[in-house]
Amino acid sequence: ENGVTYNVYADPSGSDRPWALDPLPLIIAPEEWAKVSTAVAQRAKLLNAMLADLYGDQTLLSEGLLPPSLVFGQHGYLWPCRGIKPIGGIWLHNYAVDLARSPDGQWWVIADRTQAPSGAGYALENRLVVSQVFPEMFRDLHVQHLADFFHDQQDGLAALAPVEGDEQPHIVLLTPGPYNETYFEHAYLSRYLGFPLVEGQDLTGRGETLYLKTLRGL
């Protein structure tokens, strides 16, 4: 009813399907979740440190901890970024993990999502739907709000934008387009965060400046 979809182009029944939501949540004890969140944060710091090294001193390669072919053989390695120092030393700005329970009840990370992790927009929409389906339960249980996460994301992106004085930074949400499997989330987050939703063809470079094409020009 809310129009939430996830595009599945390998599905012979169609190019998209409704987003499935079980209104009954998976219950995780606070103590258990504290361990999970701490471990995931530690993992994110490790991956950020690895990126900083691979685009910096490359100690992991020189000491034989990682084979150079594993790094340089990847098309995703950005050679122009070699030697740069990002603001705050943060290379990994968005990170997600796929979690699963092991047979003995422990949590396992089965996938790291570092390139374009999806799910934040769907999580927000899920939360809104559940709050409408179970309004009293949602209120009485003092469910933690997600708004702080998105506010931090807005502030974090704004802090990365080089501006002068009181000038507001120009931030956009880049999407491959409506045929991407998570395009709904791109459009949803664009509206929620207040960032224009753009495709690569909407941008153009002039010297060291990136411009957004609009009906009024650049």
Regions picked out by a protein language model, each given a short descriptive name:
Residues 1-218:
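Preference for protein termini
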